[in-house]
UniProtKB/Swiss-Prot annotation:
It is found in: Secreted. Belongs to the peptidase S1 family. Residues 30-170 form a propeptide. This is Serine protease 1. The keyword Lipid biosynthesis does not apply. The active site is at H203 (charge relay system), D232 (charge relay system), S313 (charge relay system). Residues 1-29 form the signal peptide. Serine protease that preferentially cleaves peptide bonds on the C-terminal side of aspartate and glutamate with a 10-fold higher reactivity for a glutamyl bond than an aspartyl bond. Disulfide bonds join C184-C204, C307-C333. It comes from Streptomyces fradiae (Streptomyces roseoflavus). It is an enzyme of class 3 (hydrolase). The keyword Transport does not apply. GO terms for molecular function: serine-type endopeptidase activity. Keywords: Disulfide bond, Hydrolase, Protease, Secreted, Serine protease, Signal, Zymogen. The lineage of its organism: Bacteria, Bacillati, Actinomycetota, Actinomycetes, Kitasatosporales.
Length: 357
């Protein structure tokens, strides 16, 4: 488990086409009607509600949850029959596994203490009941051998995989939100006491106190908070008087309404919206992920198989109408096989006391 009828102008219209990855109708136009919730949206919301209920019931009695690829059911890993009975009572499917939360947490702590190597990433994969470690192409043969030695000492609780590319934050020059001479994307519009903001990646908000919709253009927002490394989120307050919408741009003429926020579940299908690769799809492959970027580690991230590229940093990860995360980085994309990593959005919402809408 993890450690949450006035015409309106959309964010992408405000920032011009293809800027933030969020949006609705152009300024002065009638806002299109909000779509009714789709079955996919309802399914995602129901999944997260069940996952949250199981987490409240079991706490550390579970070694993680995931979505079964064949049945679509929520599977909860447990080590005792008593815990399995609680899972059944909650309406989910239990699966008995060898390692509990304490042993997996200890393996994570050992990696942090003994194998904190730039270019590595690790997180919980409850499908295998292991900590899944990835080492990118920048990790030397000597460091890889050291990593494998540490993994071998942990009684099978850790798997190590070499992956192509290099784990990096995905900032680029080009077309989207601009600050400090760099380009990023934005995740979700949020609100607090009637004031509108947008969330983006902390490594983006570290770069500049003001943000615009075009390179060198007029400022549309000012930084109100930033957190990177350790976390990877930041918040920008709108300085424009335009009323901005809270939907995500699907880059096909359509938009996804966002109604709630939740933590991602391993195995669930997600989408990523960013200003470079637009909308890409994938599944969640690990949670509670540590990524050792070259300029500092981030903790509690989520690893997915969605594709991403430079300039997508700060974009939205979502499932139906549920906001999941803020795009952080990846080790690249081969064909349709990606490694997009996100900062869980609920942590950012809590840190700044804001809500999606």
């Amino acid at each position: 488990m993890r450690r949450t009828t006035r015409a309106r102008t959309g964010l992408s219209a405000l920032l011009l086409a293809a800027s933030l990855g969020l949006g609705a109708a152009p300024a002065g136009a009638d806002a299109p009607q909000r779509p009714a919730p789709t079955p996919a949206s309802d399914s995602a919301a129901a999944l997260h509600a069940l996952d949250a209920a199981v987490e409240r019931t079991l706490g550390d009695d579970s070694a993680g949850t995931y979505v079964d690829a064949g049945t679509g059911e929520l599977v909860v890993t447990v080590t005792t029959e008593a815990a399995a009975a609680k899972v059944r009572a909650a309406g989910a499917t239990p699966r008995r596994v060898q390692r509990g939360a304490a042993e997996l947490d200890a393996a994570m702590a050992a990696l942090e203490a003994r194998a904190k190597i730039p270019g590595t990433s690790w997180g919980l994969d409850p499908r295998t009941n292991r900590i899944a470690v990835e080492a990118d192409s920048s990790v030397s043969a000597r460091d890889l051998a050291r990593l494998r030695k540490v993994a071998a000492s942990l009684d099978g609780a850790v798997s190590v995989t070499r992956v192509p590319g290099v784990f990096q934050r995905e900032v680029a020059g080009g077309d989207a939100i601009y600050g400090g001479g760099s380009r990023c994307s934005a995740a979700f519009n949020v609100t607090k006491n009637g004031v509108r903001y947008f969330l983006t990646a902390g490594h983006c908000t570290n770069l500049s106190s003001t943000w615009s919709s075009t390179s060198g253009g007029t400022s549309i927002g000012v930084r109100e908070g930033t957190s990177f490394p350790t976390n990877d989120y930041g918040i920008v307050r709108y300085t424009t008087t335009t009323n901005v919408d809270g939907r995500v741009n699907l880059y096909n003429g359509g938009y996804q309404d966002i109604a709630s926020a939740a933590d991602a579940v391993v195995g669930q299908a997600i989408k990523k919206s960013g200003s470079t690769t637009k909308v890409t799809s994938g599944t969640v492959s690990a949670v509670n992920v540590t990524v050792n970027y070259s300029d500092g580690p981030v903790y509690g991230m989520v690893r997915t198989t969605a594709c991403s590229a430079g300039g997508d940093s700060g974009g939205a990860h979502f499932a139906g109408s549920v906001a999941l995360g803020i795009h952080s980085g990846s080790s690249g994309c081969t064909g349709t096989n990606g490694s997009a990593i996100h900062q869980p959005v609920r942590e950012a919402l809590s840190a700044y006391g804001v809500n999606v809408y």
